[in-house]
Amino acid sequence: MNEDLMKHLAPRPGRYPLLPELSPRAEVALICRMLFHEGYDDHIAGHITVLQPDGTLLVNPWELAWDEITAADVLRVDAAGKVLEGEWNVTPAIGLHLAVHAARDDVKVIVHNHSRFGTLWANAKRVPPVYDQTSAQVDGDIAVFDEYGGTVDDAAESNAAVAALGDRKWALLANHGVFVVANDLRQAHLRCLTLEWRCRQAWHMEALGAGHPMPQAVADRTGAMIDGNGFPFLFEAMARREIRLDPSVLEG
């Protein structure tokens, strides 16, 4: 978030803090639930990794659906994926995450799932057009990785996916799902919901058989501004919703 810009745009303190103080594990549990309600809801599939200052990673457990995870359930693993803290197990498909974290110093958060509309476009091996402002909240090309062999726990396949991603923010994994990287949790949340919204809106527009994509220059300018500066208060609002729905998300 661009703090200097926020001081100018939102100088008033508000009536109360937007969120309670959250532990890193609580933030992971919250984003799991937030994204579940944005369409990242393929049962127990999908994984989120968050790089910590000591080089370890926080990751959701293999056994649990994203909408039931609490802070106490979140695992800590080392750079090789070995569980250091936690009572659950880590998915064997964590290899792609580990490879990207190792290859890119700018990536602190990685999200992978088989989102409802993102996976449709991944199956079509097509990048969805941008039709509206919300779809344009994030700029940059979407990579399409078209070498899926049925798993991403193979080192060679993970390395190929890393190469296909390059320095991009997101990718469609053909016949599989979506893959999003970010510098922090708030940016990851914005990028994930923007990708799924964009995929959903484009699907509906194609079903309608009408509509005109946003001019590329306008989409690029919009995305550079919003993704570059952050979307004020969005993460906090969606996190509060999850806490209202189930305060136990913060337990642990």
Q: Where are these predicted regions, by residue range?
A:
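Glycine-rich flexible loops
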Residues: M1-G252
